[in-house]
Structure formats: structure tokens, C-alpha cells
């Protein structure tokens, strides 16, 4: 009986020890922290002479939540006596350079969470007042195209800044108010977005902690092969966007509206008889244009200067220097480009109350532009019940645009840049997260598509009756400005983030290993599908089954659609050291820092009395446990001689 009692006691001790141990470290972490998955960090960008953006400390920054949602809470912050580290929660109206720099300079903060459950009540852009000024045609210009800008994007902060989605913002606002009311337990947050890059682009690249900002541009033609002897009409746009939080770069007016427009124009023209066209029409979507027009610059440089030293067996690719596609060299003659039409910001056409129509503006450069704009005016005026009219700009300089890259090489090409502004941007949120579907006029889209489709058909030599594909437009428009969950037939994968994001990202780990975001791949496949000239009877399940073509609806399809590197000419890849290097710092030198992962977690914080009570109770429990163990040990030793 005694032995049985001893055995039971030992089993109870073992059982208590086992149950006192955590099953896994993650269990404790999960019980303490709540991870917020819909969070979007500010990242760090390196330049040739410094850096801008944000980063947390290694392991993250944490602190108690402090809500600033009105002037009183903003002013009270500077007399806030809380001794603990602070994570500031900002209503979107207080997210600007003046407020944040004031907080940063006058107090120590561990990080910032920006709420998105409300809209800014004033126009705001964190970009510069003349985007890309030093890389354009007029580096000494005194114009300010973007008057609502404060340059906030280009400041550097030693703490993390996160935005969170609408639903999460409501929850964080509530628990932050809980803190402000002095209730316990209080709430804190941990922001982890450690960026490995430091100093500048040269140092960061040498250490292998950065990659060049860039991507891949896309160009396409209806012709199976462009006749190099024919004149070329180049219809183009910059399709990448920017925002303070890169994962929220919708850029509805900045680019997305124009991208939808041009894709819809191409869709309309795909259905017409093009046999009467006496000119080639090339459609181009330039990437990484917001970083010094590097997409268009790289393409032009390849057209004019590229020389392949070593080809592959069929001369379709170049091994040295590496180019995966040489169609640009075999099909496009730079001197044959006779007209450039660029769609820029066109999503906020201005209402002319006298005409009862919305106005878009024509910015021209080069020679003989009137012959082009006259045709556009004729098309627009002949379209009955049109809501759109076109006006000449009052400015002598072009707005920031990809056309500048071409005009640097020659001023003999007629260039027409179409925008929704005469001078100052009509876009109140350029480069900001609120440049979304609510910031553009979707009601003008059909008329713009019809007029531009007819216009391009006319200048190419056609005289077709245009019918726009409204169903295509109705699918594409919300997809590119609201939720990019469309066209699942074209894309086998699903976007990780449903918010459309046209940030160009980084180019890749080498010249032959490029990275293409979901949105770039989608535009490429859309273009490929629309401009296809041949569908074989070859069955396929993936692109791997289709050499030199792509797989659509179970069949291999051919198209004259191509990807082209969008990378600053200031970079080259050192194959001997397997690192990027800077070869010419006069070009844009933007690199993005590497990071392991990003996370935003919230947790509860007790008051000092509660914390002391937990400490004391823990010590009491420890002492009681030690006393119990010593007693049991002595009891077993004396009575049963077991210990």
C-alpha cells in the first residue's frame, strides 16, 4: 500500500512538471501577441548619396499605443507623461511631413501606425512638387506640377511606419481610445520591418543587402512581325505607380486609369480590319518610370546602342550581354518612329460647365504636332453625345512624362501627351494611397476609349467603325482600380494582396533573373491574348508546352508581345562577384533594401499594480513549489529511503 502511494505521488509530480512546460515557444507567443496580417510597411530605399524610408530595429520596435485623431490629442502628446515606449496611432489627417517630423523631433517614438478607416479631408501628396524633375527635359524648371506635395516620401526615419486596412483600423482605433481613457489592461504593439540596407546604394549593393529598383516593360503589336521600313506610331504610357506604402500603390489616376484605357483601346482595335493601315502601331507599357524614366530610357538605349557579342544557337537571345528577347532589335527602327501618343494622368477629366463636357489636355512637343492633334479634334467633335473634349495646354513645357526620354534623343518626332490637367495636377492624391477608384471618373472611360480607338485607327490609315468592348472594360476597370481578382483564366496564380499594386518592385538578382509582380504578368498576358495572331491546334496545360508562345484555354497562342528590361543604365551586374555594381552615377541609382519579413502584432499591457501583483504571486508560487519539493524529498528520504 505504501509503495502504491509513493508511486502515485511520483506520477503526480511528473505530471505537474510536464504540464508546467510549454508545448512549444509559438504557443506562448500566440497567447501574448495577435498578428495583424493586413498591414503594409514603409520600406527603405537607397540612393547614390543616402537613403529614405523607414526601418525597425532588428527584432522590432514595441510600445504602448497612443492615438492622435484630433488637435487636442496631438497637442497633448507633447506633455504626455507616459514613461514607456510609445507607438503612435495616427488618423490619416495627421499623416503628413509636418505632423510626423514634429513628433519625431520633439519626442522619442518607437513607431507609427497609420489608420485608413477614414479619408483625408484635404488634398495631399507625399511626392515632390515636380516628380522626376532632375531626370527629365527641364531640370532647371521653376514649374510645380504637383502643388499638394510635401516630399514626405523622401525623408528617412529610424523607426517603422505601418499602414493597416480599413477593418483593422477600426479595431486599433478602439483599443487606442481604450488606452487614452486610462483603462486597463492597456494595449501595445510591436512593429517589425527591419531593413538590411544601410548608408547608400553603393555600400548596400557591395554588401549584398539591396537590389536595383526596376522591373520589366511590355511592348506589343498586331503585326506578326513589324515591317522595319514602315513608319511607327508609338502609343504608350508609364504603368508603374508609387505611394508612401508600396503595397498600396493603386495609383488610379497616376497610371491605372490610363492602363485600363489603353488595354481597352487595343481590345477595340483588335476587332477591326487593319489591312488598310499604312503604318505600324506599337503599344508600350513602360515600367519603373517613377524612378527616373528608367524603363523607356533602357529601351531606347537598346534600340540605339545594343550590340550582341554572343548569340544562342538560333540567335533569338543574346548570351553576352544577356537579353532574353531580341525582337526589339529585329523589328523596331528608332528612326521610323513618326508619332508618339502618350496617355498620362487621364482619370480626372475637368468639367467645362460652358460646354457641359469633360476636358482632357494635349501637351505637344517636337515637330508637326498639329497634323496629329487636328485629327484627334475631328474625331472628338464628330462623336455625337460625347462627354469628352480635348483642349491645347497653355504650358510650353511637357509635364513629367515618358516622352521626355525620346525627346532627349531627337526633337523631330511629333509628341502628344494627353492628361487631365492643363498645368497643376488635377489629381489631389498623387503618390498617395487615396489615389484609388474613388479618385477617378469611371463614367468618362467609355467615351475616352472610343475616341482614342478611332483616332489611332485614323492616323494609322484606317477608316473603320469602332465598337468598344464594354464588357471587357467593365471587368478591367474595377480589377485595376479596386480589387485585382479578375481574369483567373489568364493567370494560374492568385494575388497575395487583392489591392492592385503597380509599384515596380526590384529588378531581380541578376540581369538574367528578373522578378515580375503579379500585375506586370497580368498586363503581359492580357496584351498577349488581345494581340494574338495565331492559335495552333497544339494542346497545352501550361506555357511550358508551348515553345515561343503561351498557353490559353488549352491551346498554344502566338503574339508579337514582348517583355523588356526596365533598369537604370547606371547599373551593371558583376558576374565574377555575383553582385550588382554602379557604373554611372549620373543615371538614377535607386535600390531597395532587402528584408527578412515584416509583422505588426498587438498585445495587452497591465498597469503597474497588476504587474507587481503578477511578480509577487509568481515569486510566492515559486517559493511554495520549492518548499513542497524539499518537503517531499525529505519525506521520501526519511520514510522510504528512496532519496
Swiss-Prot record:
Keyword field: Disulfide bond, Glycoprotein, Membrane, Notch signaling pathway, Signal, Transmembrane, Transmembrane helix
Cited InterPro entries: Ncstrn_small (IPR041084), Nicastrin (IPR008710)
Source organism superkingdom: Eukaryota
Primary location recorded for the protein, binned into one broad class: membrane
GO biological process entries: autophagy; macropinocytosis; Notch signaling pathway; phagocytosis; protein processing; sorocarp spore cell differentiation
Glycosylated sites: 96, 166, 333, 385, 584
Transmembrane segments: 612-632
Residues on Cytoplasmic side: 633-643
Membrane topology category: Single-pass type I membrane protein
Cellular component, GO annotation: endoplasmic reticulum; gamma-secretase complex; plasma membrane
One Pfam short name: Ncstrn_small
Extracellular face residues: 21-611
Subcellular localization(s) per the UniProt record: Membrane
Coiled-coil regions listed in the entry: none
Residues annotated as signal peptide: 1-20
Disulfide linkage: 42-54, 204-210, 308-318, 479-486, 540-551, 546-556
Subunit structure: Component of the gamma-secretase complex, a complex composed of a presenilin homodimer, nicastrin, aph1 and pen2.
Described purpose of this protein according to its UniProt entry: Essential subunit of the gamma-secretase complex, an endoprotease complex that catalyzes the intramembrane cleavage of integral membrane proteins such as Notch receptors and APP (amyloid-beta precursor protein).
Family label: Belongs to the nicastrin family.
Name recorded for this polypeptide: Nicastrin
Organism, scientific name: Dictyostelium purpureum (Slime mold)
Amino acid at each position: 500500500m505504501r509503495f502504491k502511494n509513493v508511486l502515485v505521488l511520483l506520477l503526480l509530480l511528473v505530471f505537474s512538471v510536464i504540464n508546467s512546460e510549454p508545448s512549444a515557444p509559438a504557443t506562448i507567443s500566440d497567447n501574448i501577441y495577435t498578428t495583424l496580417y493586413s498591414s503594409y510597411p514603409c520600406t527603405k530605399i537607397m540612393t547614390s548619396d543616402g537613403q529614405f524610408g523607414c526601418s525597425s530595429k532588428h527584432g522590432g520596435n514595441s510600445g504602448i499605443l497612443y492615438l492622435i485623431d484630433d488637435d487636442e490629442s496631438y497637442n497633448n502628446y507633447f506633455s504626455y507623461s507616459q514613461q514607456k515606449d510609445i507607438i503612435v496611432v495616427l488618423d490619416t489627417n495627421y499623416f503628413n511631413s509636418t505632423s510626423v517630423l514634429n513628433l519625431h523631433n520633439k519626442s522619442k517614438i518607437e513607431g507609427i501606425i497609420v489608420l485608413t478607416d477614414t479619408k483625408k479631408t484635404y488634398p495631399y501628396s507625399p511626392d515632390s512638387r515636380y516628380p522626376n524633375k532632375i531626370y527629365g527635359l527641364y531640370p532647371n524648371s521653376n514649374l510645380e506640377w504637383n502643388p499638394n506635395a510635401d516630399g514626405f516620401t523622401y525623408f528617412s526615419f529610424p523607426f517603422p511606419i505601418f499602414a493597416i486596412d480599413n477593418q483593422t483600423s477600426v479595431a486599433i482605433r478602439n483599443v487606442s481610445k481604450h488606452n487614452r481613457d486610462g483603462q486597463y489592461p492597456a494595449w501595445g504593439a510591436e512593429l517589425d520591418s527591419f531593413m538590411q540596407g544601410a548608408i547608400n546604394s553603393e555600400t548596400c549593393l557591395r554588401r549584398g543587402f539591396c537590389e536595383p529598383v526596376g522591373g520589366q516593360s511590355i511592348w506589343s503589336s498586331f503585326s506578326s512581325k513589324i515591317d522595319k521600313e514602315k513608319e511607327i506610331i508609338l502609343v504608350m504610357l508609364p504603368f508603374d505607380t508609387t505611394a508612401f506604402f508600396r503595397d498600396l500603390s493603386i495609383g488610379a489616376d497616376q497610371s491605372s486609369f490610363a492602363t485600363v484605357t489603353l488595354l481597352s483601346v487595343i481590345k477595340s482595335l483588335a476587332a477591326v480590319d487593319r489591312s488598310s493601315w499604312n503604318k505600324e502601331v506599337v503599344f508600350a507599357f513602360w515600367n519603373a518610370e517613377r524612378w527616373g524614366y528608367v524603363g523607356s530610357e533602357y529601351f531606347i538605349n537598346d534600340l540605339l546602342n545594343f550590340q550582341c557579342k554572343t548569340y544562342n544557337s538560333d540567335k533569338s537571345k543574346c548570351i553576352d550581354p544577356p537579353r532574353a528577347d531580341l525582337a526589339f532589335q529585329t523589328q523596331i527602327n528608332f528612326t521610323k518612329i513618326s508619332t508618339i501618343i502618350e496617355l498620362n494622368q487621364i482619370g480626372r477629366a475637368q468639367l467645362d460647365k460652358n460646354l457641359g463636357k469633360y476636358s482632357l489636355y494635349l501637351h505637344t512637343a517636337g515637330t508637326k504636332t498639329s497634323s496629329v492633334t487636328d485629327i484627334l479634334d475631328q474625331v472628338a467633335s464628330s462623336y455625337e453625345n460625347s462627354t469628352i473634349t480635348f483642349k491645347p495646354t497653355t504650358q510650353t513645357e511637357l509635364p513629367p512624362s515618358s516622352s521626355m526620354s525620346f525627346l532627349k534623343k531627337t526633337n523631330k518626332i511629333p509628341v502628344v501627351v494627353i492628361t487631365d490637367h492643363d498645368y497643376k495636377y488635377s489629381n489631389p492624391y498623387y503618390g498617395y494611397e487615396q489615389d484609388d477608384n474613388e479618385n477617378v471618373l469611371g463614367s468618362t472611360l467609355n467615351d475616352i476609349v472610343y475616341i482614342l480607338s478611332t483616332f489611332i485607327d485614323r492616323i494609322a490609315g484606317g477608316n473603320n467603325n469602332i465598337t468598344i468592348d464594354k464588357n471587357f472594360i467593365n471587368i478591367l476597370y474595377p480589377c485595376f482600380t479596386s480589387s485585382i481578382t479578375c481574369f483567373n483564366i489568364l493567370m494560374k496564380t492568385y494575388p497575395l494582396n487583392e489591392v492592385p499594386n503597380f509599384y515596380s518592385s526590384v529588378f531581380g538578382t541578376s540581369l538574367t533573373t528578373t522578378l515580375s509582380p503579379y500585375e506586370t504578368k497580368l498586363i503581359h498576358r492580357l496584351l498577349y491574348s488581345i494581340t494574338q495572331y495565331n492559335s495552333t491546334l497544339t494542346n497545352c496545360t501550361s506555357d511550358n508546352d508551348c515553345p515561343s508562345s503561351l498557353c490559353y484555354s488549352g491551346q498554344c497562342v502566338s503574339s508579337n508581345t514582348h517583355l523588356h528590361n526596365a533598369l537604370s543604365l547606371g547599373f551593371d551586374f558583376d558576374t565574377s562577384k555575383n553582385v550588382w555594381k554602379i557604373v554611372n552615377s549620373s543615371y538614377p541609382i535607386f535600390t531597395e533594401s532587402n528584408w527578412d519579413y515584416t509583422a505588426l502584432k498587438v498585445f495587452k499591457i497591465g498597469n503597474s499594480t497588476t504587474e507587481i501583483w503578477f511578480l509577487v504571486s509568481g515569486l510566492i508560487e515559486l517559493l511554495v513549489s520549492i518548499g513542497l519539493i524539499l518537503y517531499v524529498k525529505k519525506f521520501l528520504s526519511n520514510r522510504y529511503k528512496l532519496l
